[in-house]
Amino acid sequence: ILTFVTCLLNMHTKELMESIGNFTVRQMSLMTELRKDPLTGLYNRRSFEESLEKEILQTEETGEKAYIAIFDIDHFKNVNDTYGHSNGDVVIKALCKMLKEKSKDYGLAFRYGGEEFVILFSNIELPKVINVVEDVRTEFRCYYFQFMNNSGITCSCGVAEYSKGESAKAWFNRADNSLYQAKEAGRNRTVVSE
């Protein structure tokens, strides 16, 4: 009888452990889903804000350079209004694929909201940041969108280097102001904060 009870306990323990394991996997999957944008697969704004705070702490500790690059698709409302939201999604996905691919060795790409995206660069010098940003911008401008039967959708970018002691909000605002300057200067360009 004792052997039977032991076998029964082992069987239930195994089932319980499998259930806990399955629950943990589901929980981790849900946590990942909460951190990613469902359309693009990029990390979302919440993830960006958390990563930005961590980057500031790391940069303050190590003295390494860090940059924010904010991208915005130029005249995106016109794309949605003229070609429909599903084609607008095609445009967003195309840019996100480029952002993810070009930034993978230097930082992380995020969807900040709507047609606005961010790359958070770590331990990198400005010339390399500019190369990555300009590669994305140029490739996006030349990308052929079949639904339009041409290319020519552009994006603008604002870049800011982290300054020692700066808050996350101040750092982001400097990059955002640079983006605004790029838009004001005619779009399809990059402006670096001074």
PLM feature segments, named:
Residues F48, L52, V91-I92, C96-L99, ...:
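Heptad-repeat coiled-coil signal-transmission/dimerization helices
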